[in-house]
């Protein structure tokens, strides 16, 4: 198996949509039940900072975050890794690279949301220094405070 190559902001909206569809059964609640994937992929491609994992020219992992320079708050909108690339640290590598990028941009905090019932994802985020900051229905809000880097 080829090693994962990490790129930033290189995936097209079509590649992102294809990746999200391929990951749909990995999510606790199917992504297609929550968003319109083509529109979501287009928004990510246009507005998010994307840290991408590629293997054999196929997008196997994606962490996408929006950054508001005025508030210095980043929001991770997507963390997804194909089943074939899970369990070998791919998601952690991509998440840490995203955190580093947000800190370089000046983020003082990084936020994300996760389904309360998704124990695997919750543990993953706790392992990466995110803490619970609130609840909205069955959605757990998490935050990581950052040291800014320049």
Located regions from the model:
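Loop/helix-junction capping segments adjacent to catalytic residues or to phosphate/diphosphate-binding pockets
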Residues: 14, 88, 119
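Short coil/turn segments at alpha/beta junctions that flank glycine-rich nucleotide-binding fingerprints
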Residues: 88, 105-108
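C-terminal "cap" of GNAT-fold acetyltransferases
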Residues: 3, 108-122, 127-150
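Generic structural motif
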Residues: 11, 56, 84, 117, ...
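Base-recognition residues in the alpha-helical recognition helix of bacterial helix-turn-helix
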Residues: 78, 86, 114
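Acetyl-CoA-dependent GNAT
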Residues: 3-77, 82, 95-96, 101, ...
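Conserved acetyl-CoA-binding loop-helix of GNAT-fold acetyltransferases
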Residues: 81, 87-100, 123-127
């Amino acid at each position: 198996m080829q090693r994962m190559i990490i790129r930033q902001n290189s995936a097209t909206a079509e590649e992102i949509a294809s990746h999200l569809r391929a990951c749909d059964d990995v999510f606790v609640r199917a992504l297609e039940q929550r968003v319109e994937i083509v529109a979501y992929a287009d928004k990510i491609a246009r507005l998010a900072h994307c840290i991408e994992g590629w293997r054999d020219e196929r997008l196997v992992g994606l962490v996408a975050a929006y950054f508001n320079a005025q508030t210095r708050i980043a929001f991770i909108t997507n963390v997804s890794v194909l089943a074939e690339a899970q369990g070998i640290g791919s998601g952690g590598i991509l998440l840490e690279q995203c955190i580093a990028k947000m800190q370089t941009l000046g983020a003082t905090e990084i936020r994300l949301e996760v389904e309360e019932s998704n124990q695997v994802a919750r543990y993953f985020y706790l392992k990466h220094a995110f803490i619970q900051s609130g609840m909205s229905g069955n959605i757990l809000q998490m935050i990581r405070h950052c040291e800014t880097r320049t």
